Amino acid sequence: MLEGSWINRREDKLGVYSLVHFSPKMLGSVATTLPLSSSNSSGMPLGYYLSSPQISRVTISTTGQLTSKATVGSCSRVENSLDASPFSVPKKQDESPMIGDGEDYFLSLFGDSKKLTAHSNYTQKTLKYFSMILEEVGQFTSSSLGDVEIAEVNVKGLFVKLINSSLDKEMAIGDHILQQNVNGQTISLYRFLPNIVMQANSTVTVWAAASEAKHQPPSDFLWKEQDKFRASPDCITILCKPNGQAIAWYTPIHWKQAWEKLDADVEFNRCSVVSPTFRKRVFQWTASTATITKEKQDQPKKDISNYQVEQAQVLLKREKEIPPTVFPNRSPWCQNPYVSAHPYCPLIEPHNTSTAGGRLDRQPRTRSTRPNRASGSKKKKTSESQKQ
């Protein structure tokens, strides 16, 4: 198998010269040297030599005039001599490994074997789980209000089986009605004989005519008029009292419901998968929480009580600020609200009943009672002027 490669490519205006060197492990000591011409296109293709089972080491070199451009690539092993021109093919006569065979070739085509194994295991688990669900296709969903239950409706429609789940009680099913409904419509109806009693932990089977069973009451009843019972998923089998009250009912599970259940379970499993990094973070968070909780538990009760007292004191020191109250402006000398108040007068006057009563009793003084000094002086001035 080839382990590494080293390519030296030289370009000039006239042509391209390349040096290819593969340096794998040596499988044998015997080597065969073959001459190689400078023109590879006219001779045997290079792929022929590479695909030969005898080749384990290939050295190809062409020499030419070096010009301006040169590109050198190196791998695990770099050799100093670049002027070697022979084409050497070491071979081993005992072993002849085929390139393209074995596990490596298989993995190159189909991927890692571990991944394939994991995928196959997941597929097997899914198929196994689905087979378990398919086994339950013949099962049912049954409900009852008492001890008498509908245990089974045969898939082929041959019988319907009732069971008394009580361990110490006898149940009377005389004149009870066993019916089957599809979309709310009754398609078949069977009435039990009167005075039929089911013993504790016993079964009663109603057989269809196609079963060719024998009529052996009180455990086996043959319904000759009914060829087969209906066992489809859309059919509900009901056991009713003589007055029509349902006391037990039975519904089979369809394979489509089983498939839907499988899809739901697979989707739930995908959603519930937790990545390893997330689990690690969860575990770290849990560990840190446990450490903090332990440290808190180790603290003495006195510190906790002191902390509570200090916290209460801090709460007591805080005072709630009362927002300022804005009173409406009004004049203290009149009742007109549009007159602004005097700046040196308080906005709120104390209420005094005596003064309030005196103000109400007081009457306003008329203008006639007031002496008019200005008018008197004018009269005197007019009389003096007349005398003169």
Swiss-Prot record:
Biased composition range(s): Basic residues: 365-381
Pfam family, one: LTD
Classification via InterPro entries: Lamin_tail_dom (IPR001322), Lamin_tail_dom_sf (IPR036415), LMNTD1 (IPR042840)
Domain annotation LTD: ranges: 136-254
Annotated region described as Disordered, given as residue ranges: 349-388
UniProt GO BP: cell population proliferation
Leader sequence residues: none
Record's keyword terms, sorted: Intermediate filament
Cellular component annotations (GO), alphabetically ordered: cytoplasm; intermediate filament; nuclear envelope
Highest taxon, organism lineage: Eukaryota
Family from the record: Belongs to the intermediate filament family.
Protein name (Swiss-Prot/TrEMBL): Lamin tail domain-containing protein 1
Organism: Homo sapiens
Taxon lineage: Eukaryota, Metazoa, Chordata, Craniata, Vertebrata
